[in-house]
């Protein structure tokens, strides 16, 4: 709450005192609930010093303090208006009584609003001392108020008057807090410190609650809400895990090749199961692993070659599969584009036809007022269909359904009137041939565009089909080449094996011939006695027998060579 003090007259009337101002303020503004609970203006005013009174807790209320209008400076004899003359008797006996005005307050917290005054009032100590207000800035609490209360109001009035007259700039304002106000007015708080945020006591007369207590409650509620939000924040951060959906595999997609060990496992699993039918999968896998480790590199290479060939075939099939997917996607996108273009053309034609229909009907008006005289059952019996327009826009077709129970004398004039309106509209369409030609041109352009789009789509489809055929041909050629290579490799291996077998046979024959020659040489080197005895005949007789196998062996060699030649010839014919 901002309390404003207005300047008094320059002459400082003697009749103005602190009690009069408080009496006027309590009587006029607060009624029964007085601001300072002052007594009435009579001789019992000083009895208030012996009584205790409570200051109400001022909430957000706003009080209007009327300005104190001073008399003009030209008339010094008039110190105060006539309305304040009866109260001058209260200020006269103050010095004669000798009693001190010591208001007492119960030990309670006060929620008094700050009063805004000029800042230079606090800084200029000389002005305050000259006006009679003695301020001790070192002490913030004063026990008793020992001066004349009239001097306080006079000093305050002089301070505001000095601010208005230009001694102090009015723009510099400061705020006096509660402790400074209590120190200046001499409020004896009984040793209780004034707290700005303490709630009002329950004995306070004001019905409104203290704003400080409500602020504290709101702060507590906000703190509790913040704690609750912090507790619920980690719970809300945890989101349930959504199960990942497995993608459905396309049955047309080629399968990935199997490793060499998997091929070996397939080959050996059946044999192991046959030998050990009660063996588990783990035992079988252990046996297969040991067998795989015991295999040589050549046998492993056989399975590795098979896997490499399967990988090559898989890559080729995968390329073909992806090409087919691309072609399908392109075809679907082309179909979607054609559908969209057709829909757009249809929508544009519908819009143009509806616009032309509306313009023709607005130019020639609606059905004349003669059908309005028909009875209420007429709209139910006659239901005109909407006007249908064709593309050339040369004629407008209308159809009217007439109920069986409708009298003929009512239907005839209605049909005749509608016919006249339709004829008028037809003539109007004939009158504007330029519009028809423009529409016809637009339709022709749209048809041409559609035809071009269709042709482009067909060309794209043909190109895609050709690409697909080319890919298939390439795949077939590659497969045929691969098959031929495998066949050639097999034939080469067979030819090599045959050559090796022939070489082995030739080596065996050569060894056999060498042995025979050695034996023959040994027999010739032995000395034979020249005796015509049966022993010599027996000894000499085996020589031709031993030498006789030579022509047989010579005959056997050409037979073997002829056989090898016959085996090589069919192989050459295959190549």
From Swiss-Prot:
GO terms for cellular component: cytosol; nucleoplasm. Residues 254-322 bind DNA. Residues 189-258, 516-575 are annotated as: Disordered. The keyword DNA-binding applies. Residues 527-541 have a biased composition (Polar residues). One of its GO terms (biological process) is regulation of apoptotic process. Residues 239-249 have a biased composition (Basic residues). Residues 195-214, 516-526, 548-575 have a biased composition (Low complexity). Pfam families: HMG_box. Keywords: Activator, Apoptosis, DNA-binding, Nucleus, Transcription, Transcription regulation. Residues 222-238 have a biased composition (Basic and acidic residues). The keyword Translocase does not apply. GO terms for molecular function: chromatin binding; DNA binding; phosphoprotein binding; protein homodimerization activity; transcription coactivator activity. It is found in: Nucleus. Homodimer. Interacts (via HGM box) with CITED1 (via C-terminus); the interaction increases estrogen-response element (ERE)-dependent transcription and protection against cell death. Interacts with CREB1 (phosphorylated form). Interacts with CREB1; the interaction is not depolarization dependent. Interacts with CREBBP (via C-terminus). The C-terminus is required for calcium responsiveness but not for transactivation activity. The N-terminus is absolutely necessary for transactivation activity. Transcriptional coactivator of the p300/CBP-mediated transcription complex. Activates transactivation through cAMP response element (CRE) sites. Protects against cell death by inducing antiapoptotic and repressing pro-apoptotic transcripts. Stimulates transcription from the estrogen-responsive or BCL-2 promoters. Required for depolarization-induced transcription activation of the C-FOS promoter in neurons. Associates with chromatin to the estrogen-responsive C3 promoter region. This is TOX high mobility group box family member 3. The lineage of its organism: Eukaryota, Metazoa, Chordata, Craniata, Vertebrata. The gene is Tox3.
